Amino acid sequence: MRIGLLGTGNVARALAHGWSAAGHDVLLGSRKPDERKDLGLPVAGLNETAAHAEVLVNATPGNVSVDLLRSIGAPALAGTLLIDVGVGLSDDFTELSHPNSSLAEQIQTAFPDTPVVKTLCTMDATTMVAPAALTGPSTVFLSGDDAEAKRTTGRLLTDLGWPESSQLDIGGITSARGQEHFALLFIGIANGLGSHTFTIKVVTLP
């Protein structure tokens, strides 16, 4: 599958390496692609990356994601599955940019013809692509209004090492708020543990 990843930071690079290892055709999208040729991964401009992609991944800072996607244009994104892994936070990481909503909802509202699925934002880049390295099974969440888009996303999560038994569909795109709002607790837990390589495991009573 042709996967375009918007962004060239740790998350975008980790996901690109993970999906490339699983046999997918990956391309990173940058506003300044000529300055990002040292990544060991193919890099192109944002519009070229969007045109390349069967699946587009938003791995840009949540504060700029919607404007960046608007620069590509709704016609170029129409009908393309967009997996959103971003979270909007203040510069000091103490406040959410969308406290009464979510980045995923903002993207879906701005691009109604683009199915959006939220996932992978409750963990760091290392954990996203190496769940088997954790001390036990954990949970990855999916939010979105389009059932087929979530099924495709689930298959791509499986390719990163997340079995179906670890994937939990928590509802429509409004449920992305729960995923994104975990970011503040994630920061607190990371400070307490002295490590960012952890994630959530949903457990139930027998």
Write out the residue ranges for each language-model feature.
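Rossmann-like NAD(P)-binding element
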Residues: 34-35, 40, 46-81, 86-91
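NAD(P)+-binding Rossmann beta1-loop-alpha1 motif at the extreme N-terminus of oxidoreductases
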Residues: 1-42, 199
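Rossmann-fold NAD(P)-binding glycine/threonine-rich loop
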Residues: 78, 86-133
